[in-house]
Regions:
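Catalytic-core region of carbohydrate-active enzymes that cleave or remodel glycosidic bonds
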Residues: 66-67, 99-195
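Aromatic- and acidic-residue-enriched segments that line the glycan-binding/catalytic groove
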Residues: 1-3, 57-62, 89-95, 137, ...
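Non-membrane alpha-helical structural segments and their capping/turn regions in soluble enzymes
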Residues: 10-17, 54, 138-145, 205
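Catalytic cores of secreted or luminal carbohydrate-active enzymes
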Residues: 187, 191-212
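Catalytic cores of eukaryotic secretory-pathway lumenal/extracellular enzymes that build
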Residues: 2-10
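Active-site neighborhood of glycoside hydrolase catalytic domains
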Residues: 11-90
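Conserved, mostly hydrophobic/aromatic
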Residues: 23, 41, 123, 161, ...
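N-terminal, Lys/Arg-enriched amphipathic/low-complexity engagement segments
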Residues: 77, 94-97
Length: 212
């Protein structure tokens, strides 16, 4: 209900438009088209986990183009039917987010791609975020290395999520709500390969990557 209300309320879309018209012109000089290193931009973020309003997604994509973005656009969602059907557009590249079962996830992604395109994991979850009061999440390196090798052998592209664990300043960390309020800590450590202050944490993952 919240998603429907947010999408259908015109003053919210007006606010989004105003924000994009302020934000995107600042990024355009950094885009590849203008000699920068931004080669692609994402439309929404895992929208299929919350809604399926295609008109809203089209609005966001068209707004980005209207603001001067010429780079590749893509959507990023979980590798499940409801998420990929709800969060994607037919003429825009789709990538999937996951931390395991890479082969199965890419097969599901191809069912929705609609055109020939490279396989990409937008968020490869090599770790996980922490809520206040919880034990720090730590993922064993072996399954991370195994999935990494599978993706490299298949020729897929991926982003580590996270490669460097930075900081969520102020109240930007966000929260979840699973029967109770679960605020996220200000550290975005996420059991990343590089921790919050830049130290290396997973010495056995990088040699595996270099072998390819």
């Amino acid at each position: 209900e919240i998603c429907v209300f947010a999408v259908c309320t015109s003053h919210i879309l007006t606010s989004v438009s105003n924000y994009y018209h302020e934000l995107l012109p600042r990024l355009l000089p950094l885009c590849h088209e203008n000699g920068g290193n931004i080669i692609a931009m994402q439309v929404e973020n895992e929208y299929g986990s919350y809604g399926n309003d295609k008109e809203y997604l089209k609005f966001i994509a068209e707004l980005m183009r209207d603001c001067g973005v010429k780079e590749l656009l893509f959507t990023s969602d979980g590798p499940q039917d409801d998420m990929l059907s709800g969060g994607t557009l037919p003429d825009i590249l789709k990538v999937a987010n996951f931390g395991s079962r890479a082969s199965a996830s890419f097969r599901k992604l191809k069912e929705y791609q609609g055109f020939k395109a490279p396989s990409m994991c937008g968020e490869f979850w090599n770790g996980w975020f922490d809520h206040f009061g919880e034990k720090h999440h730590h993922r064993a390196s072996a399954p991370v290395v195994s999935e990494l090798k599978n993706m490299l052998r298949s020729g897929a592209s991926f982003n580590f999520y996270m490669f460097h664990g930075g900081t969520n300043f102020g109240f930007t960390a966000g929260a979840n709500h699973d029967k109770c309020y679960q605020p996220t800590i200000t550290s975005y450590d996420d059991d990343a390969l590089l921790n919050e202050w830049g130290g290396r944490t997973r010495i056995n993952i990088m040699p595996s990557a270099r072998s390819f």
